[in-house]
């Protein structure tokens, strides 16, 4: 349940970061000019959003893998590959434990592009 709260909090922060920075304007030179680039701020927000999204996806992938382990139906080929990839890095939950390091591990792998190996 805590993983769900974390994902919800991250998603809320993503909503805040999605507001356009180009709508902000800072007049300079005694209001004669208003050319203040917000490009750097926009780029920072995009980078931060990418990191937050990788954390949300990591939480979702781990929870989905746990669910797959507990159902009798067999998932499709693509889902099997994703499940196998997650299980290479995160052990099944056999008892109560902190998910922080597991979520951080998968998040980092997503940011580094390691997931692209799933469908090669």
Which stretches of residues belong to each language-model region?
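C-terminal auxiliary extensions adjacent to catalytic cores
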Residues: 1-120
